[in-house]
Regions:
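Bacterial N-terminal signal peptides that target proteins for export
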Residues: 2-11
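C-terminal motif of bacterial Sec signal peptides marking the signal peptidase cleavage site
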Residues: 19-22
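Internal, hydrophobic beta-strand segments that form the core of beta-sheet-rich folds
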Residues: 128-164
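A beta-strand/beta-hairpin structural motif
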Residues: 96-98, 106-124
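A short beta-strand element within beta-rich, extracytoplasmic domains
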Residues: 58-69, 132-138
Length: 166
């Protein structure tokens, strides 16, 4: 009887392990950077360096934002720069919806912390292999003001991820 229980435990462990591994098959790169006091400083760019070998298959690129209930806006403006190994650079100003019309945050999560997986580039084929650098900083302003908010509260983590397309 003890032998059967041991085999069942091993079998269940292997099933769980294979499930966990298969869930991450699509992820090529994923990294988060925590922000002190859940505050994103306007003059602090967040950088992610990653290596690209595959220049044939398309990938989906995501900006990942973890916000809490102190985030004061229903949207988020960011400025991104993707630097290529050959010196080329793509700069984008992007807007993402963070809350619905009722003010409920759109990200996933059951607590006050919400995970937002935001499309940055869809089906991107990297033209050259080598080291890439992704930079992001927020560009949030209060209505009617010109200056960027120096300390954006409620942003706990900023991440960047690359996934294989299905």
């Amino acid at each position: 009887m003890e032998m059967i229980l041991k085999k069942n435990r091993i079998f269940i462990f292997l099933i769980v392990l294979s499930f966990l591994v298969s869930c991450n098959d699509q992820i090529v790169f994923a990294k988060y950077k925590s922000l002190p006091n859940a505050t994103w400083e306007a003059n602090k760019s967040i950088s992610f360096e990653f290596e690209v070998e595959d220049t044939i298959l398309p990938k989906n690129l995501f900006i990942n934002i973890r916000n809490n209930k102190k985030y004061p806006f229903s949207n988020m403006y960011v400025i991104t720069a993707l630097s290529f190994p050959n010196g080329n650079k793509i700069v984008d100003t992007l807007q993402y919806q963070m809350a619905d019309k009722s003010g409920n945050f759109l990200g996933k999560g059951f607590t006050d912390i919400k995970d937002n997986k935001l499309f940055y580039k869809e089906e991107k084929v990297f033209p050259v292999s080598g080291k890439y650098l992704f930079n992001i900083h927020h560009a949030m302003r209060k209505n009617g003001e010109v200056n960027i908010i120096p300390f954006l509260e409620g942003v706990q983590d900023v991440g960047f991820s690359i996934e294989k397309t299905e």
